[in-house]
């Protein structure tokens, strides 16, 4: 049993005692508990249990809690070494004289590597703990010039000579310190929020494995995980489990680009070898509220942004099917060939769901490829209560679904799902001989790299697969339902208050709640260009003050001819009603004098 030195107060109170018995009979239970902390967990708990026998309930609870807390803290910085009987334990290490060259694979570099990584784990665990602590700021904002000039020794400039591991650890801490805590319960700025602990563990393991997704031979488990997960996602969309295909991509914008490439290859496979000159003048259709990535893909793939035709939306941001059909007929009359329609399930700003069934009818009528961009709204497919909002998605030819948004998977995690098997392979396959040999000893259909436009592809699947295992489909359903309930709570809280105006009438379909804060100076004033101009400046001013204070973050933007408004989105499972209350109170506090 490890020894423990009695506290100074205990030593002082025993000044006249027999020195041979002073340490055997400490005057406080805390001293004995200190001895217990130096023991193994099992023996330490026995000592605490012995001390409890004659104590009050309050003292019993305090002793065991204190012991368990200190044991837990100690164990945070130790891990089982599967190859040895002992443990890795954190020891005092002078990192100022150690460098990257002293770590593995350096000879005798194991101990330094262990101590360095334990320090990094300590940094990460402190960051995780503070992220969920609401007394911690969401961000410690500094302007770009301040960070570039250096903050308290934090230097972004690269050096010619190696810096010590001590400086590297400082850089690790500072990088997190000056970043934004996107997992904080009061971060509402983006569609991707939260910090899932299982997902975090998966990402750590993914980085440690440091492999590539292009062939089964170097990523066998990850490739199988991806296929199983994509198959499950296609089934949830409503497609046959036997058919279809898919792949994880670097984000929703790339997934949407895949869908356009697949559509073009399906109808005009010669484009792969002969280029756009070999095909008619093709046009794409998407709503005026859709994600800008559709126009960006049009530019990148050679269609041109002028040939990405925007369809009018109603006041809730949904495609007007009649306008879609009219625009298709107009394009045909002008000699263009309509190719592709993008319907959005969860628009970025309003959270609107396009009427997929009606759009699918039009696509079938004119033989067009139907893609559903469900990057933001795809998570609702996991909810029996809300999946009806995507009714008709099973009729789509392709679907974008980003688990890193509504499902809370750590960035990045986006899937492109295709109804017809073989199109991705045919569209992108180049048969690079150094990777995709046909005479391997295993089934080469598991080599997925030739389906992708990339060569190297990051392992995005493991954290998602691990979260699904940990939560189950029901866990994701509960998580998504909770976020939508919080959006309903926010809407009900502000819809009838004079300090707020809703951007559109009616309850939101998704967790997007769009509203204006009306400062005292603008209340009761009739709508006019002058009032709209003043209102346009309110949200940016409040957002700037919000970032300076660091207490919370929420996004704002204009839409069409509407003045800047706040767009509140909820996808963080850690958020609660009290966080919604705090946000509203903070907006009022920061905006009351505008």
From Swiss-Prot:
Keywords: Decarboxylase, Lyase, Neurotransmitter biosynthesis, Phosphoprotein, Pyridoxal phosphate. GO terms for biological process: gamma-aminobutyric acid biosynthetic process; glutamate catabolic process; locomotory exploration behavior; social behavior. It comes from Canis lupus familiaris. It catalyses: L-glutamate + H(+) = 4-aminobutanoate + CO2. Its EC number is 4.1.1.15. This is Glutamate decarboxylase 1. The keyword Phosphoprotein applies. Residues 1-13 have a biased composition (Low complexity). Gene3D superfamilies: 3.90.1150.170, Type I PLP-dependent aspartate aminotransferase-like (Major domain). Its cofactor is pyridoxal 5'-phosphate. The modification N6-(pyridoxal phosphate)lysine is found at residue 405. Disulfide bonds: none annotated. 4-aminobutanoate binds at residues 190-192, 567. The modification Phosphoserine is found at residue 78. Catalyzes the synthesis of the inhibitory neurotransmitter gamma-aminobutyric acid (GABA) with pyridoxal 5'-phosphate as cofactor. The lineage of its organism: Eukaryota, Metazoa, Chordata, Craniata, Vertebrata. GO terms for cellular component: axon terminus; cell cortex; GABA-ergic synapse; inhibitory synapse; perinuclear region of cytoplasm; presynaptic active zone. Belongs to the group II decarboxylase family. Residues 1-22 are annotated as: Disordered. It holds the Pfam family Pyridoxal_deC.
